[in-house]
């Protein structure tokens, strides 16, 4: 993707690196250079740290050391989580590109037999995305009235989905606490839809996303596993929810806290478009592999919700595009429609889709191809807004 950037000059690099013995004049120059590039010393240092971890990960791949691959994959992901929120808010498009390549690396590294070629390829792309970040600058452009209105409209959509999420989670956790497994299965899928439509918003709000949506292997050693997927495992795998009342209560508490945070949320047009791209990346990277809903197998429910959330963004910015970029809006209209037609083949009723484990490799590839095409077209919005 081609985003507006400013290159970091050699003088700027020297200013950033010359920390020891710097006098007041050099400190002033360093600050000016940082402001000019838009990227702080802390971000540059964090990028350098990630590049070091990537190199060590690739060394482990070369040696075929599966334990070390898993360890470095987790370390890379954990380090990114330590500063990603600052990147998400100030550099949303660069953030999305980094996520697009980091997610498959992390997923692959956790496998018993990781694909070495895939890790290497994605690592190179990740390093390029990190380099783009170090050369990025914050947008100084004031949003047009149309785009500002679009951001407000999307915030209204997010609030509505969050409100429905609270209600659906109340019903779901109530079923869990009553011990009704079959009812819990039905209500689990309904609640997931509302969460997946606004997932990037939840991810931007600190620790709430891992509390609500972490899978078991995402939880750091010593941390407590909570949220939807802990209950999913109890319902489908263990088939015993008698001991999950505390988990249900915590999930509802966290979802309500998320809803409260969303009420005061401020969003820019850049952030909402990046969020739409992130949703499509999420669908194409984790949902399409069946990694997300490993016990319930409702991955297609999540996947469709991601696409619906992305389309909601598109519909809010469409009016700002249609006059000068009608070719792009027509293409997106067609591609969203085609994807919905394709997904309709797998719909079993108003609320559900075919279980992921019933799909053939050919069907999964077809869905993946459509998602990739849609994601690439959606990314063009970033260039024209």
From Swiss-Prot:
Pfam families registered for this protein in UniProt: Peptidase_M75 (PF09375)
GO cellular component: membrane raft; plasma membrane
Disulphide linkage map: none
First and last residue of the signal peptide: 1-22
GO BP terms: iron ion transport
Localization, UniProt: Cell membrane; Membrane raft
Complex formation: Component of the iron transporter efeUOB/M complex composed of EfeU, EfeM and EfeB; EfeU is essential for the complex formation.
Domain notes: The peptidase M75 domain contains 2 metal binding sites, site III and site IV. Lacks the N-terminal Cup-like domain present in EfeO proteins that contains metal binding sites I and II.
PANTHER family, sorted: IRON UPTAKE SYSTEM COMPONENT EFEO
Name recorded for this polypeptide: Iron uptake system component EfeM
Species annotation: Bacillus subtilis (strain 168)
Gene: efeM
């Amino acid at each position: 993707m081609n985003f507006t950037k400013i290159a970091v000059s050699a003088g700027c690099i020297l200013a950033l690196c010359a920390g020891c013995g710097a006098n007041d004049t050099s400190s002033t120059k360093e600050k000016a250079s940082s402001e000019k590039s838009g990227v702080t010393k802390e971000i540059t240092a964090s990028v350098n740290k990630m590049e070091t971890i990537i190199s060590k990960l690739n060394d482990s791949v070369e040696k075929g050391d599966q334990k070390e691959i898993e360890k470095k994959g987790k370390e890379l992901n954990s380090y990114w989580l330590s500063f990603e929120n600052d990147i998400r808010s100030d550099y949303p498009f660069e953030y999305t590109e980094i996520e697009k390549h980091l997610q498959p690396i992390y997923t692959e590294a956790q496998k018993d037999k990781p694909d070495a070629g895939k890790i290497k390829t994605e690592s190179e792309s990740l390093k390029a995305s990190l380099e783009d970040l170090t050369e990025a600058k914050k947008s100084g452009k004031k949003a047009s009235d149309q785009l500002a209105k679009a951001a407000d409209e999307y915030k209204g959509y997010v609030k509505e989905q969050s409100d429905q999420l609270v209600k659906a989670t109340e019903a779901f956790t109530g079923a869990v606490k009553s011990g009704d497994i079959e009812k819990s299965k039905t209500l689990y899928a309904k609640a997931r839809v509302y969460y997946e439509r606004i997932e990037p918003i939840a991810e931007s709000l600190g620790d709430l996303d891992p509390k609500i949506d972490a899978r078991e292997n995402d939880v750091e050693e010593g941390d407590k596993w909570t949220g939807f997927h802990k209950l999913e495992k109890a319902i489908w795998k263990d088939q015993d929810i008698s001991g999950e009342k505390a988990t249900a209560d915590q999930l509802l508490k966290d979802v309500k806290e998320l809803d409260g945070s969303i009420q005061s949320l401020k969003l820019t047009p850049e952030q909402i478009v990046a969020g739409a791209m992130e949703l499509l990346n999420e669908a194409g990277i984790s949902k399409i592999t069946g990694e997300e809903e490993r016990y319930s197998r409702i991955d297609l429910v999540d996947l469709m919700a991601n696409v619906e959330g992305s389309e909601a963004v598109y519909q809010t910015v469409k009016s700002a595009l249609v006059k000068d970029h009608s070719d792009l809006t027509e293409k997106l209209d067609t591609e969203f429609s085609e994807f919905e037609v394709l997904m309709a083949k797998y719909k079993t009723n108003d609320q559900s889709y075919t279980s992921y484990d019933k799909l053939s490799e050919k069907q999964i590839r077809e869905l993946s191809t459509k998602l990739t095409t849609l994601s690439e077209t959606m990314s063009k919005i970033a260039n024209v807004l």
